[in-house]
């Protein structure tokens, strides 16, 4: 499913640029994605659109997010740490954070790998028609294993 999401991000500027589900499904199938993977991704994207509508409100700058035990188990320490990093860097506003958590909880298996969470964060930006800052974009695309430490 994550491969399909990355393909959509790389090939369509915004969700509005995507064709309807039926046509998009055919295109993705022609590119070589499996039907189950396509259906999972399209269903996940529908949930993302719903999350965008329901998490549009503002929260106080001093609000503190407390993760439920189920969220802690499903997301894992590394993913929660990454979300906190993005928040403290001022990149992820509270409504976007809630969208990320909502969509991460929609992934069946846990704990969620940070690499998968990065794709979710990228797709949240994409769904809102926003481009993350260049350094954050680099952080979302580059694996830690590929980094050179000076």
Curated annotation (Swiss-Prot):
Query: InterPro entries, alphabetically?
Result: Smg (IPR007456)
Pfam families listed in its UniProt record: DUF494
Q: Say which domain of life the source belongs to.
A: Bacteria
Protein family membership? Belongs to the Smg family.
Q: What name is this protein filed under?
A: Protein Smg homolog
> What organism, scientifically named, is this protein from?
Methylibium petroleiphilum (strain ATCC BAA-1232 / LMG 22953 / PM1)
């Amino acid at each position: 499913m994550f491969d399909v999401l990355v393909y959509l991000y790389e090939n369509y500027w915004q969700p509005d640029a995507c064709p309807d589900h039926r046509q998009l499904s055919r295109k993705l199938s022609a590119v070589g994605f499996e039907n189950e993977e396509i259906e999972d991704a399209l269903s996940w994207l529908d949930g993302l659109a719903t999350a965008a509508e329901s998490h549009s409100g503002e929260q106080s700058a001093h609000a503190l997010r407390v993760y439920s035990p189920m969220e802690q188990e499903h997301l894992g320490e590394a993913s929660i740490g990454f979300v906190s990093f993005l928040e403290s860097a001022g990149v992820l506003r509270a409504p976007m954070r809630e969208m990320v958590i909502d969509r991460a909880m929609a992934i069946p298996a846990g704990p969620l790998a940070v690499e998968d969470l990065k794709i979710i964060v990228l797709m949240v930006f994409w769904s809102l028609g926003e481009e993350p800052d260049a350094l954050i974009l680099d952080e979302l695309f580059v694996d830690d294993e590929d980094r050179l430490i000076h």
